[in-house]
Amino acid sequence: MWSGQPHPDEGHPPPLEAVPVPWKSVGPCKSHRESLGGLPETPAGEEAQGEEGPAATQLDVSRLRSSSMEIREKGSEFLKEELHKAQKELKLKDEECERLSKVREQLEQELEELTASLFEEAHKMVREANMKQAASEKQLKEARGKIDMLQAEVTALKTLVITSTPASPNRELHPQLLSPTKAGPRKGHLRHKSTSSALCPAVCPVAGHILTPDKEGKEVDTTLFAEFQAWRESPTLDKTSPFLERVYREDVGPCLDFTMQELSALVRAAVEDNTLTIEPVASQTLPAVKVAAVDCGHTNGFRAPIDTTCALSGLACACRHRIRLGDSESHYYISPSSRARITAVCNFFTYIRYIQQGLVRQDAEPMFWEITRLRKEMSLAKLGFFPHEA
């Protein structure tokens, strides 16, 4: 390979050498200078460029500074405008939030008032319902007591009717059927006619019954009648009223004052609350002390009397009835005398309850005489007078 420079002796022509040519500065022609707009000549222009270089640089820097400041001012103005807009929007939003807060508070207050009124109305309805229920229960209780009393009376009337049939008349209920020896007084107990008439002009017990004459003298006690009229204006079962306080003291208390004081108090409370029940019982269900197993042939289903102990008086006698206090399952057997005393008091309370409820449509005087008759029954029952049972 070939390397290096060629030599002249190898047949090649010698290299050309650079010949220095002197340069002459030639100025532009006149026409060219005119076309350039009267620019200075080249040497003068170069001198001007050399002198104006730092000034141009300072001019550029000042221009940059002025443009930068202008940009900053515009940016500051823009930011101020944006800040003003944001503050304005924020103020509007604050006002809207405040308005919504007021609306929410108003709604909460209205909701609270509505809830309170609803609860108050609900409590009022519940209270009225409870009062109506209590009144209904009280009326139901009283109605049941009346029904029980009427059933007991119906049972007693049925017993009287059955034992007074033509085939088997009840001679004790019809004294005219008794023989003269049975109907008359016992020997050794005869009284003078005038003395007997003077001692009992109104009632005379014959064969276990009270016979009332057809005509009786009546006279209204003004004090008692005034107390009754004052009670009748506003009838109540409160024992503090003068009328009921007198009846309790003179009739109800003594009539229900039995030997067994504790049970007597319970019976009195049950009678006042109208929760006492009197039930007739067959003799075979009684706790027998002395049992007479011979059937007497009665058509009412009772056997011969069975002796037992009265729970109120403590006496051993034939107990055809028993009492139950309230909802208790316990029963207490009572004698006919105790039953008559309890029944007399129950009849009195039933009548004054009818007056209290407005069921008695009478004037004051007939009502007063009916109450006087019921008080008379309590007094007689306390003294031991009662209808003899079949």
Curated annotation (Swiss-Prot):
Biological process, per Gene Ontology: protein transport
InterPro entries in the record: RAB3IL/RAB3IP/Sec2, Sec2_N
Give the modified residues of type Phosphoserine. Answer: 168, 179
Q: Which UniProt keywords apply?
A: Coiled coil, Guanine-nucleotide releasing factor, Phosphoprotein, Protein transport, Transport
Which GO molecular function annotation, any one, does this entry have?
guanyl-nucleotide exchange factor activity
Please list the residue ranges that the record marks as compositionally biased, kind Low complexity.
40-58
Indicate the family of this protein. Answer: Belongs to the SEC2 family.
This protein's name: Guanine nucleotide exchange factor for Rab-3A
